[in-house]
Amino acid sequence: MRFLTFFLLLNTFLFAQEGVWYKDMDHALANPDSVFQLQLKRKGLNAFPSELSQFPNLQKLDLSKNKIGAFPDSLNHLINLTFLDLSRNKIASIPASISQLISLEHLDLWHNDVDALPYQISELPNLNYLDIRGVSMSHGDYGKYKELMKGVDFYMSAPCDCQD
């Protein structure tokens, strides 16, 4: 009976933690198994934090408005990730290994330096939202991806040299 009570309390606690956005890496690292949502926007990051591998339950990751230049080829450990916001960074390319993020539903690449998407992005089985506004691709490429990814809400526009 005690075990059952403990198990139910633990599940209730973990379920309650799913709605919490951690906004500080040190705080998140203090309890990595309870990190479901991590928001590190406007932190001046130049790269994906290597500590991401310590969050096995991570579902939502917001790295927007940083200076990240490269999308690592080694995010396959984030199998529970459903939401990834990389908008307003300096990412130049997306690796084919993005197809390993099989739970990904929402991908925001708005305002990056990407000039092409890997074909494998169309293999994400749960993707239903893709924002590639401001990505430098030809109109033909936009059409190709839109055709390959029917059922995905596509947000796209030509890039601009806008000043904030």
What is each residue range found by the language model?
Residues 26, 48-51, 71-74, 94-97, ...:
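The feature encodes a structural signal of leucine-rich repeats
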Residues 3-13:
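Sec-dependent N-terminal signal peptides
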Residues 113-164:
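Leucine-rich solenoid repeat scaffolds
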Residues 31-33, 53-58, 76-81, 99-104, ...:
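Leucine-rich repeat
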Residues 36-40, 61-63, 81-86, 104-109, ...:
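Conserved hydrophobic beta-strand positions in leucine-rich repeat
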